[in-house]
From Swiss-Prot:
UniProt biased composition (Basic and acidic residues): 1-11, 409-426
Protein keywords: Cytoplasm, Phosphoprotein
Lineage of producing organism: Eukaryota, Fungi, Dikarya, Ascomycota, Taphrinomycotina
Protein's UniProt name: Uncharacterized protein PB1A10.13
Any one GO cellular component localisation term in the record: cell division site
Annotated Low complexity bias: 321-334, 456-470
UniProt modified residues of type Phosphoserine: 128, 217
Subcellular localization, as worded in the UniProt entry: Cytoplasm
Keyword Transferase in annotation: no
Compositional bias per record (Basic residues), positions renumbered to this chain: 83-95
Main location: cytoplasm
Comp. bias regions, Polar residues: 27-40, 110-125, 170-199, 237-249, 336-362, 430-455, 471-488
Length: 529
């Protein structure tokens, strides 16, 4: 607030101290106003001009002593309506309301052109003094007689006449003062606007200078102007936050996990988690990898035959980062991550969970640790359950992994495999409730559930069997009726990753693991602040 405005506010309050009220108090409805209260010291950060208007209307209120509290409240309600809802409940402007009533009366009384013109000017006169910022006390601007208080309730013809005389007599004087005041007002507005422009432009220039120098240190967020902050927020992609390694460690493992090379399974997941970033960003950040990492307008989906083919080539041992078809380049990063031992990967997952990085680490492959020569179908199922799924909008192709395999083959192979589940003594009801039907989608949904159940038994032995059983029951009961298991909160936070068939209303959801959820929350928080 400028100092001149503050001065005016103070003057207005001094003139109307009789009618002002304690700071921060709002008038309750149908409550008569107290006769004397202390003037507000400061109204906090509320609109300053609202305060000015309040002061002015209070000063004009001193004459309206005949009104009861209810009538005043009614009047204030109509006033709020007239001023487009901007007015405080306590900024009452009776002159405006009364004059409009009188104008209507005048028009009904006689329809002469001169009278109509008079009415117009009187209405203007009574509306415009609200903008008056110069006069110390507005009692002179609104010469309202006590008899006028009747006009709102008893609409007598005599009071109307009196009111007309009063308004027409002061019209000229009022117009003179208001024109002066309004010109001053516009001047102050112009100066403040230019000032704000200047203020906004300075941090921008600083940003540009820093960019020219090539320094990596960002400008503190607090020093940016609001426009600059908005621009910054629009330019940064949603999940790409600054990667802060935990405990100031910068090891190769972390770098591999944070920015995987193009063509790894993790990179496919990253494509689903991240919006398409413009090409110039990747180029400026890492010129070395910009050639390998294709800029995607839409997240590209890995076609399933390639997954199957990779599984066959690797002898069933599917690594976390097996190169997919759409990028043939095997970068050193991919080799690094594939040569890691399973225990290392587990460590990376646990260490990386709370940090803010743009990739999703989904729990290490149990097939890698448990059975190196697993069957191809199991491998595909587990891989499929790991890849983040997303509804792509057209039709029902929201499954990532196995979309293009012909249905009959898939059903045959899966129904052959799935009933054999010797590894789960903790879940007696699993095989009975989720034996696959002949229907294509249901059978492989059940298979996915079972494989993920098995994986959860491997990955998180800490989960209690009863908890797991209840989760499993909630899944299979649903999937036996219509192949889209709803995941409950319990299943969401149970620690084990789950295959979730997307229903119509669900968001793009990964296989829900606790680490991933925590990471998303963290990234969202950092992307906001």
């Amino acid at each position: 607030m400028s100092s001149s405005k503050i001065k005016e506010l103070r003057e207005g309050l001094m003139s109307s101290s009789k009618w002002s009220m304690a700071p921060g108090m709002m008038m309750q409805q149908n409550q008569p106003r107290p006769a004397t209260t202390t003037p507000p010291i400061s109204r906090g950060n509320e609109d300053a001009d609202e305060g000015l208007n309040t002061a002015r209307s209070f000063s004009s209120f001193q004459d309206l002593k005949g009104m009861s509290g209810d009538a005043k409240e009614q009047e204030s309600a109509t006033l709020v309506h007239l001023t487009k809802g901007r007015a405080h409940p306590r900024s009452r402007r009776p002159p405006r309301q009364i004059s409009i009533d009188s104008a209507k009366k005048e028009e009904t009384k006689n329809t002469g052109s001169t009278k109509a013109a008079d009415t117009k000017s009187s209405v203007e006169a009574t509306i415009s003094p609200l903008k008056d910022t110069k006069s110390p006390s507005n009692a002179s601007v609104f010469p309202i007689k006590p008899t006028e208080s009747k006009t709102s309730t008893t609409k007598d013809s005599e009071t109307a006449k009196e009111e007309d005389d009063a308004s027409s007599s002061t019209t000229k004087a009022v117009e003179a003062t208001t024109s002066k005041a309004s010109s001053a007002h516009t001047d102050t507005l112009a100066t403040s606007a230019s000032n704000s422009d200047r203020g906004a432009s300075t941090p921008e220039m600083v940003v540009k200078a820093e960019k020219r120098e090539g320094s990596t240190s960002p400008i503190p967020y607090s020093s940016l102007s609001i426009a600059e902050r908005i621009k910054q927020a629009q330019n940064t992609p949603f999940l790409e936050s600054k990667v802060l390694p935990q405990n100031n460690e910068t090891s190769d493992e972390e770098n591999v996990d944070v920015k995987p090379a193009a063509g790894t399974v993790k990179n496919v997941m990253q494509a689903f988690l991240q919006p398409a970033t413009p090409a110039k960003d990747t180029a400026s950040k890492e010129p070395s990898k910009s050639s390998q990492q294709p800029v995607r307008t839409k997240p590209r989906i890995a076609q399933s035959p390639f997954l199957a083919q990779d599984a066959k080539e690797n002898g069933g041992n599917v690594e976390v980062s097996s190169p997919l078809s759409f990028s043939a380049s095997k970068s050193p990063a991919a080799v690094d991550s594939s040569t890691k031992t399973p225990t290392e990967q587990v460590n990376v997952v646990s260490k990386q969970a709370p940090t803010t990085s743009s990739t999703s680490v989904i729990s290490p492959d149990p097939l890698q640790t448990a059975a190196p020569s697993a069957n191809v179908n199991e491998v595909i199922a587990s891989l499929e359950s790991k890849v983040v799924t997303r509804r792509t909008g057209s039709g029902n192709n929201y499954r990532v992994g196995l979309r293009n395999v012909s249905g009959s083959e898939r059903t045959k192979s899966l129904s052959k495999e799935s009933p054999v589940e010797p590894e789960k003594p903790a879940l007696p009801d699993a095989t009975s409730s989720s034996t696959p039907t002949t229907e294509n989608k249901e059978s492989w949904t059940n298979q996915g559930i079972k494989s993920s159940q098995q994986r959860s038994a491997n990955a998180s032995p800490a989960t209690s069997p009863s908890n797991q059983a209840s989760i499993h029951a909630s899944f299979t009961k649903e999937s036996s009726t219509h192949s889209s298991p709803s995941f409950t909160l319990e299943s969401l936070f149970s620690g084990a990753p789950r295959v979730v068939e997307l229903t119509r209303f669900s968001q793009p959801s990964p296989a829900c693991s606790r680490a991933l959820l925590a990471r998303w929350k963290e990234e969202y928080r950092t992307s906001i602040h």
